[in-house]
Every structure is written in C-alpha cells, then in structure tokens.
Amino acid sequence: MELRQRRERLPRPSMRHVVVVMPSAFTLGNLFFGFWSIVSAFNGNFRWAGWFIVFAGILDMLDGRVARLSGTGTRFGEQLDSLVDLISFGVAPALLMYFLDFSNAGRFAWILCYIYVVAVALRLARFNVLSAGKPSTGWFTGMPSPSAGMMLAVYYPFSQTNWYRASLAYMDLQHEGLVVLMLLLAVLMVSNVKYPKFPPIGVRSARGILGLTVHLLILFGGIFAPEYFLFPLGLLYMAFGLVRTTVLGLMERPEPVTVIGERVADAHDPTLPPPLSHERRRHSGDRRQEPE
C-alpha cells in the first residue's frame, strides 16, 4: 500500500518537458553524425564521411524548426547548437579534405584546413552576437557554415560521377581546385555577403509556394541523384551571393548631399562650383544680414 502511494506521488514527465528537450536531441544527433564523419574520414571512407555531414546538416535544420514551432528555443540550445556546428561543419569537413587530399600535399598543407576551421568559428561567433535579442530576417550575413561544410562534404561523391570524370578529371586540378574552394568558402563565411535563408513552406502565399517548390526540388534531387545534384547546387548558392552583391554594388550611386540649401560639389563632377568654405560662408551670411 505504501509503495503504491509513493509511486503515485512521483512526478510524471509531461509533454511540455518532452517538447523542450526535442531541439537539443536533434542537436546531439547532429554532433553524432559529425563525430562519425571524422572517424570515417580517418579510416579512409570518404564517401560516407561526406554523407554523415549532410545528415548532420539535415538535423541542424530540423532542430531550429522544431524550436521555433514549439516555442522552446533557449539560450542554452543556441550555444549548444553553435558548439556542435563548429565540429560538424568546421572540424569534420576540414579533416575530410585533409585526409582526402591535403595529407599528401606537403608539410604545411594542413594550415589551410586550420584556416577553414577558424573561419567557421568566427562565423558562428558573429552569428551569435548579431542574432542575440533581434528578430530573424530572411538573409544571412556571410555564407552559413552548414552550407559551406556540406558543400565540401558532397565534393567527393560528385568527383566519382561519370560526368565529372568525363569533363573535369582530365584537367588534373583536384588539389588546386580544393585549395581555391576552401579559401573562397572561408572568406565568404566571414564576409558581409548576404545569402538567403530557405523560404517557409506554405500554400497560401507566393513565398510559401516558392518555399514548398524549393524544398521539393532539393528533396527530389537529393534522393534520386545526390552525387550529381548537391555539389552543383552548392556552387549555385555560393555564386548567387557573390553575383547579387556585385550587381547591387554596381547599381549603387552616391546621392547628392545638401548642406544649408547648397549642393556640395562632387569631385567627379567638374560642372559644379566648389563649396564655400566655412569662413567664406560666415562672411557671406553676415553681409546678407546687414541692413540696406
């Protein structure tokens, strides 16, 4: 009788507690695949090492979605997510590239992999600072580290395709291409280049339909032709941010500046007279104020 009463007094886990830990469970799953990728790369299984990073990226996307939909996002979860992302999308891709190509490229080739990890760490630290207490926008500042990490992860499966062997393998530029790719990704992650977030899924608005279409295309390509589809998709995403920033920079024009009703002369416009100095403007103003 007493044992039954004690059992009845024990608190039972509520659904609220289960929902709260779900985002962290996805994050720890992300860490699991990131660590498994490192072990696989060390053992020379480069194909699965890359796919494990992709699986980590899927869980990284899901933990944020679950936290937002359930309203259970916490500061602890945000910090845990950043630490896990550093391993899954920083250390794991860098070691994959090292064991795949850079281990035989010279004594100090590992430094490039280290630079990539540093860029991921800086990218995540800046993201935490910029997003603290601010509403989410539709753009990332700098290329997201999961996108960069997964792009490196799917390079090896892409390099084993017949299309790659028929069109690019004869150039024998794998090492040089990986050097350029890793440096470019490192620079883009710490840059101010804007990259779009995935649009939300829906059927009641144009943006929602666009998001649904994008997700379905990625799902279709990722299931039926992942080796051919994912790496070119990453290149397209990387190029989009660069092209967009370049075009917007070329379209920007300096606006005319007005000071006390007068247009300031532009150094590149010889038709405009030079602006009055402060002393000349003061004397001119004094003369205008004198009684006639």
List each model region and its residues.
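Topogenic membrane-insertion module of multi-pass membrane proteins
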Residues: M1-M61, R244, E292
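C-terminal membrane-associated helical module and adjoining short loops/tails
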Residues: M1-P11, T137-E292
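Short juxtamembrane and helix-loop transition motifs at transmembrane-helix boundaries
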Residues: E8-V18, F42-W48, L69-E78, A105-I111, ...
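Multi-pass membrane catalytic core of lipid/isoprenoid biosynthesis enzymes
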Residues: V20-T27, L69-F127
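Hydrophobic, membrane-inserted alpha-helices
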Residues: F32-F35, V91-A94, L212-F220
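Helix-coil boundary and interhelical linker segments in multi-pass alpha-helical membrane proteins
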Residues: W36-W51, I87, V91-I111, V154-G177, ...
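Alpha-helical transmembrane segments and their membrane-interface exit regions
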Residues: G57-L62, Y116-R123, V187, L235-T246
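C-terminal ends of transmembrane helices
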Residues: R65-T74, A121-T137, G142, V190-P199
